[in-house]
Amino acid sequence: MQLIRSSDYGFWLLSQGSHIHLVNNYLPEGRAEDFHLQGKKGMVIGELDRQPLWLVEEQPNDTRAYFDLRDQLYLPERTFNLLNRGVELNHFFKTHQFCGKCGDKTMQTEDEWAVQCTNEECNYRTYPVICPSIIVAIRRGKEILLANHRRHAPKYGKGGMYTTLAGFVEVGESFEQTIHREVFEETGIKVKNIRYFGSQPWAFPNSQMVGFLADYESGEIRLQEEEIADAKWFRYDEPYPEFPEKGTIARALIEATLKLCAEHQDK
């Protein structure tokens, strides 16, 4: 990052954790001095509406109004992904101030998004950590499997949002192996015909959601109760529970699978 000058112009992204500063529901636009940002550290991370998008180093004691990045899912995909980029970079810089190899201080590199050890005998370079997570929608004929995760259920019970299954990729696993493992661990179900669907950066704090469609192969629902409060097969034409928000890859997976369910019914 560089010192921001009074005359620097563009959109300004300030973050605190996964929250971002907004003015009238949008990123502030103007000269740095308009927002008292001169002298702070920042860098351009992209372009928004043909103007530079500046990421400002996280200001822990800033009193501006900050809003949850999750609430910005209505924005165009490219805009939301740029905001994810900024939030993830600030998280990376904040959590990698010391070298993971020798323990000396790090400094941000000028040629790429990375930090490098200041110890000349080490010079170890570290890049932003991205933690891939699979997310999968499972179809059985004209039904979709949806789960009520513990984090979405009211305390001590069921209810709330039902969504797809997801889980982090473990060391040495392919995405397909993760799908088989996670689905079986959480529901006791085995799947087949796994197809890639799409992906979404998810800066909470540094995930990449990799989406798949899959078909039911065998098994009866058996819950991993510490993770899953409930899981059911829902017909495409029956009343649905609460779904994830539009703009999430989970919602897109569900809608794509419900369409496949309807097409199966018509055959």
UniProtKB/Swiss-Prot annotation:
GO biological process: one example: NAD catabolic process
GO cellular component: cytosol
Enzyme class: hydrolase
Residues annotated for a divalent metal cation 2 binding in this entry: E182
MF term (GO), any: manganese ion binding
Superkingdom in the source lineage: Bacteria
Binding site for a divalent metal cation 3: E182, E186, E227
Tagged with keyword NAD: yes
Record Gene3D superfamilies: 3.90.79.20, Nucleoside Triphosphate Pyrophosphohydrolase
Positions with a binding annotation for substrate: R70, E112, Y127, Q200, P201, W202, A203, F204, P205, N206, S207, A250
Domain Nudix hydrolase: 128-257
This enzyme's EC code(s): 3.6.1.-, 3.6.1.22
Binding site for a divalent metal cation 1: A166, E186, E227
Cofactor remark from the record: Divalent metal cations. Mg(2+) or Mn(2+). Binds 1 zinc ion per subunit.
Catalytic activity: a 5'-end NAD(+)-phospho-ribonucleoside in mRNA + H2O = a 5'-end phospho-adenosine-phospho-ribonucleoside in mRNA + beta-nicotinamide D-ribonucleotide + 2 H(+); NAD(+) + H2O = beta-nicotinamide D-ribonucleotide + AMP + 2 H(+); NADH + H2O = reduced beta-nicotinamide D-ribonucleotide + AMP + 2 H(+)
Record motif Nudix box, residues: 167-188
HAMAP family, per database record: Nudix_NudC
Assembly information from the UniProt record: Homodimer.
Protein task: mRNA decapping enzyme that specifically removes the nicotinamide adenine dinucleotide (NAD) cap from a subset of mRNAs by hydrolyzing the diphosphate linkage to produce nicotinamide mononucleotide (NMN) and 5' monophosphate mRNA. The NAD-cap is present at the 5'-end of some mRNAs and stabilizes RNA against 5'-processing. Has preference for mRNAs with a 5'-end purine. Catalyzes the hydrolysis of a broad range of dinucleotide pyrophosphates.
Protein name: NAD-capped RNA hydrolase NudC
